[in-house]
Every structure is written in structure tokens, then in C-alpha cells.
Amino acid sequence: MLQPKRTKFRKTFKGRNRGLANGTDVSFGTFGLKAVGRGRLTARQIEAARRAMTRHVKRQGQIWIRVFPDKPITSKPLEVRQGKGKGNVEYWVAQIQPGKVLYEMDGVPEVLAREAFNLAARKLPIKTTFVIKAVM
């Protein structure tokens, strides 16, 4: 699963997920899966969607993952009183704003790409849409 090799700080503030996304255009492939909603994707969700796409296209073409989980989420164990510091890092998330391209694909027909992205979208907790690279 995806996570940073090393970070400057082990734990981060909760923060807010506001604003507009960077990476709103299909850059590498021909087809893309774009976020319509706002939320967080865990490393497990990113990997589950990638596997669903890869298996559907039977390893033909190429897939790019355009998001990376770089924010640690901490939690305290069950039945532990409050205080005594911040909990341990449990998992990593990528914060997603509307318009962000999550995955890209190339080298497969459009029908197959649509089906693969539809399978991937079912694994994700945010609303997404299928996009095609704009021809200049």
C-alpha cells in the first residue's frame, strides 16, 4: 500500500479539506476518473480501486495513480481515557477536492476504460465521473 517513505513530522493536525484541486486535467493517459465530491481516500481504497481496474483490463494498457496518501490519521486504542498525548498513526489518507483526477488510463478502448473506471468508482467513498483528454 502507498505511504510516504519518510516524513518531517510523524503526526499532523486534522486540518480542513477546503478549496479547489490541483491536477484537474488528464495529463498522462487518454481517459481519467475525476472526483466530483470532496473527501478522503485511504491507501487501502486507492489500492482496491487500482486492483479492480487492473483486473478488468487484464493487464493491458497502462494505469496512472494521480493521488498519494500523505496525511497520517491517528487514533487512540479502545477503552483508553482521554489525555496522555495523541494516538498512534493508524493509516494514511489523500485529501481530495472536487475536480481532482484520481486515475488515468491509456492503451485500451473507451468502452473497456469506462467499465474499469465504473468498477473502481464503486470502491471509492466519493462521487466520481469519467473524463476524456481534451484534444487541442
Curated annotation (Swiss-Prot):
Keywords: Ribonucleoprotein, Ribosomal protein, RNA-binding, rRNA-binding, tRNA-binding
Gene Ontology CC, one term: cytosolic large ribosomal subunit
Record InterPro entries: Ribosomal_uL16 (IPR047873), Ribosomal_uL16_bact-type (IPR000114), Ribosomal_uL16_CS (IPR020798), Ribosomal_uL16_dom (IPR016180), Ribosomal_uL16_sf (IPR036920)
HAMAP family: Ribosomal_uL16
Subunit structure: Part of the 50S ribosomal subunit.
NCBIfam families per the UniProt record, alphabetical: rplP_bact
Name of the protein in its database record: Large ribosomal subunit protein uL16
Organism: Photobacterium profundum (strain SS9)
Lineage, top ranks: Bacteria, Pseudomonadati, Pseudomonadota, Gammaproteobacteria, Vibrionales
